[in-house]
Swiss-Prot record:
The gene is rps17. GO terms for molecular function: rRNA binding; structural constituent of ribosome. Transmembrane segments: none annotated. One of the primary rRNA binding proteins, it binds specifically to the 5'-end of 16S ribosomal RNA. It comes from Saccharolobus solfataricus (strain ATCC 35092 / DSM 1617 / JCM 11322 / P2). This is Small ribosomal subunit protein uS17. HAMAP family: Ribosomal_uS17_A (MF_01345_A).
């Protein structure tokens, strides 16, 4: 549990503002003990479940060398949403890789892109 006098951690990701709201979530990169390591990605929330989990979709271009053209692809990533970050479906967010939190969740939402 987080005590009231404990300082807020800064994960060191550029262009991320630390949330003003304080949460008691142990899987929060700001107020808990979750460490962010690995890659950081940017995507749009397409589904937000009430169980502190969201589905983030990112679209990217893939070069097909046979036809010498680019094709659009998408990937859907499941991510944990801490209670101190207010997001809704359609918001553009930055997610960071962390340890596996469940069978399909290995990313955490770090903040909204404004």
């Amino acid at each position: 549990m987080v005590s009231k006098g404990k300082t807020v951690k800064d994960p060191g990701i550029p262009n991320i503002t630390i949330p003003e709201k304080v949460c008691e979530d142990e899987d929060c990169p700001y107020h808990g003990s979750l460490r962010v390591r690995g890659i950081t990605l940017e995507g749009v929330i397409v589904k937000y479940r009430g169980t502190k989990a969201a589905v983030i979709e990112r679209q990217y271009l893939y070069y097909d060398s046979k036809y010498k053209r680019y094709e659009r692809r998408r990937s859907r990533i499941h991510a944990h949403v801490p209670p101190c970050i207010n997001v809704r479906e359609g918001d553009k967010v930055i997610i960071g890789e962390c340890r596996p939190l469940s069978k399909s969740i290995s990313f955490v939402v770090l903040g909204k892109v404004s």
